Amino acid sequence: MAKVQVNNVVVLDNPSPFYNPFQFEITFECIEDLSEDLEWKIIYVGSAESEEYDQVLDSVLVGPVPAGRHMFVFQADAPNPGLIPDADAVGVTVVLITCTYRGQEFIRVGYYVNNEYTETELRENPPVKPDFSKLQRNILASNPRVTRFHINWEDNTEKLEDAESSNPNLQSLLSTDALPSASKGWSTSENSLNVMLESHMDCM
């Protein structure tokens, strides 16, 4: 049984300009004291074409963590535009929150992110070279995708077989029925969105 359950994630300052920091309010619960730190990361997917464009925006160690419910705000700087392919700067991508214990990832929360120009002229006639200062970031906060992995929480047991499952306790938070629609300015097709998110949610 997992010793840590993520109860809720709230996306703060959303939507916001591209260069604003990412901010997530994370609430989690430990069923018993943890002797080692939890490592949290925020990862920005720079391109659906290759993971080489993924950027770890920040990582933080939390712990040792006593049993009980805990909440903290995880903030990370915006991604480095120089590491994002021009073709992927505008449109839909993904941001991930991961947590590991003893070097083993046990939960991954993924959100769709839409980067678009707020000015009509720029939307209709986008510059060849993206102008990140004019982009607005909008995280689809209502529809995260959560994947959990079985890990070895103890020192004296063999490593468990890796597996993943949706967290039933977060069903209201994790509904994947609704995806971004073109009517809301999310122009990427549902199929390509699913492929992009699945590829990052299923890897360890």
Curated annotation (Swiss-Prot):
Give all Phosphoserine modified positions. S192
| Subunit structure of this chain's protein | Interacts with histone H3 (via C-terminus), including histone H3.1, H3.2 and H3.3, and histone H4; the interaction with H3 is direct. Probably interacts with the heterodimeric form of H3-H4 taking the place of the second dimer. Interacts with the CHAF1A, CHAF1B and RBBP4 subunits of the CAF-1 complex. Interacts with CABIN1, HAT1, HIRA, NASP, TAF1 and UBN1. Found in a soluble complex with NASP and histones H3 and H4; the interaction with NASP is probably indirect and mediated by H3-H4. Interacts with CDAN1. Found in a cytosolic complex with IPO4 and histones H3 and H4. Interacts with CREBBP.
Keywords, A to Z? Chaperone, Chromatin regulator, Chromosome, DNA damage, Nucleus, Phosphoprotein, Transcription, Transcription regulation
Please give the annotated consequence of changing D37A.
Abrogates interaction with CHAF1B and HIRA
What protein name is recorded for this chain?
A: Histone chaperone ASF1A
- What about PTM? Phosphorylated by TLK1 and TLK2. Highly phosphorylated in S-phase and at lower levels in M-phase. TLK2-mediated phosphorylation at Ser-192 prevents proteasome-dependent degradation. Phosphorylation at Ser-192 by PRKDC in response to DNA damage promotes the histone chaperone activity and ability to replace histones at double-strand breaks (DSBs) at stalled or collapsed replication forks, leading to RAD51 recruitment.
User: Which portions of the sequence form the region Required for interaction with HIRA?
Assistant: 155-204
Q: Which domain of life is it from?
A: Eukaryota
Q: Name one GO molecular function term.
A: chromatin binding
Its job: Histone chaperone that facilitates histone deposition and histone exchange and removal during nucleosome assembly and disassembly. Cooperates with chromatin assembly factor 1 (CAF-1) to promote replication-dependent chromatin assembly and with HIRA to promote replication-independent chromatin assembly. Promotes homologous recombination-mediated repair of double-strand breaks (DSBs) at stalled or collapsed replication forks: acts by mediating histone replacement at DSBs, leading to recruitment of the MMS22L-TONSL complex and subsequent loading of RAD51.
Q: Where in the cell is it found?
A: Nucleus; Chromosome
Gene Ontology biological-process annotations: DNA repair; DNA repair-dependent chromatin remodeling; DNA replication-dependent chromatin assembly; muscle cell differentiation; nucleosome assembly; osteoblast differentiation; replication fork processing
- The UniProt annotation puts motif Required for interaction with HIRA at 31-37
Cellular component (GO) terms are: chromatin; nucleoplasm; nucleus; protein-containing complex; site of double-strand break
Which organism is this protein's natural source? Homo sapiens
Show the PANTHER family listed in the entry.
ANTI-SILENCING PROTEIN 1 (PTHR12040), HISTONE CHAPERONE ASF1A (PTHR12040:SF8)
Region forming the signal peptide? none
List the expressing tissues: Ubiquitously expressed.
Q: Report the family membership.
A: Belongs to the ASF1 family.
- Tell me what happens on changing V94R: Abrogates interaction with histone H3 and histone H4. Loss of interaction with TLK2. Reduced phosphorylation
Q: What is the effect of changing S192D?
A: Mimics phosphorylation; promoting recruitment to chromatin in response to DNA damage
**What does the UniProt entry list as the effect of changing D88A?**
Loss of interaction with TLK2. Reduced phosphorylation
* Transmembrane region(s): none
Q: Where is this region: Interaction with histone H3, CHAF1B, and HIRA?
A: 1-156
The record's listing under Pfam families reads:
ASF1_hist_chap
